[in-house]
Amino acid sequence: MVQLYPEKLLNIITTDTMEEKLVTSFKKYGVSGYTILRARGAGSSGYDSDISGFDSNMMIKVIVPEHRLQLILESLERRIRKGYHLTVFVSDVQVINPEKFE
């Protein structure tokens, strides 16, 4: 049986203009990698069709050990309080190779 290890999956939905700021923040907190996907949908701010290609939405996925998560969440919460549009949610995941996320 394959050994699995617990980690946290941080998902952030925001605008493309936030990418550089968030990536810089991730590096500051020791995040080793991330995945960025285009995102479309509707929510509290209305519908985003991504027709213009300008300031469209993206989803960033980051797997982190629990001990790194709190500082990252505090940083995101500060940005939200400053008025940045961020939707943040965290899930429990299991990975085969935990050293990849340290």
Residue ranges and their predicted role:
Residues M1-E102:
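Positively charged, small/polar-rich N-terminal and surface patches that mediate targeting and assembly
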